[in-house]
């Protein structure tokens, strides 16, 4: 794969690349600016207009990403990447900063700030997502029946600081296992403690297994330079975030993934589950479970034009119990 770093192609198809004659050192700067026009209409759900005056909100123009960075390889086994998202603020300005040492195809170590091993939607190569926004079911915070302003988890874990081992076995089985801070993309400092309940480091423990029967699945949701692929991916991922949300909860996540590339056609579907259980100090015995998922597809109707659609489903309330009692 020429995008095995999960960031941008090193094969020289886009932009330019600096490398030594022997090819043992490759350096590639890149720039990605994403602009979008947004229109969102929200159902008032029968509420009085005095309390919910506008059905149209969060609409207009936006620049969610203005990424400047560089990536590359050294000594034939070390990959690296550093990128800044000028459209973000605070700690999220530093989007990625990591190095990856591949001892062999079956075993590599990655250290720094990078994507946690959860969800095909997040793990897609920079700039090659089907739609400009991630599924809302991954990014929207859940609603809990307590006035705890610091407890607003969402299912997606996104970027984080940590260490991960990963590899590819028999050119069809992939694995990723890592330890992360569990504080997300906006925090670049070490702020974790030991769990008072479980007596283990209060970190994010995450893993992902993939099966790709037709060879390595490119981490793309549509690339006009790759219209002759025939690949398929099945994935299972899970994580436990110990004492997350300001040491208030222990969050468990499980996800199922499917993705397919067949010439001009791309299809994907994911389903994910999150259980939010409170730490003993909160004195809340009840836990809350949430389900979400989406299906999406894209088709290149012209060499550089891809039509896309997504159906996203998510109930921000404790919808496992809603399903059981309905």
Name these PLM-found stretches:
Residues 41-49, 87-98, 123-127, 186-195, ...:
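Outer-membrane beta-barrel translocator domains and adjoining extracellular loop/strand segments
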Residues 2, 22, 55, 98-102, ...:
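Outer-membrane beta-barrel pore domains
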Residues 15-185, 201-216, 226-227, 296-317:
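Outer membrane beta-barrel
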Residues 83, 150-152, 192-196, 241:
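Active-site rim elements
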Residues 7, 217-220, 267:
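Short, structured loop/turn "capping" segments at alpha-beta junctions
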Residues 8-10, 58-62, 89-91, 154-157, ...:
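Short sequence motifs at beta-strands and strand-loop junctions characteristic
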Residues 1-17:
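Short coil-to-helix leader/linker segments, especially the first N-terminal amphipathic alpha-helix
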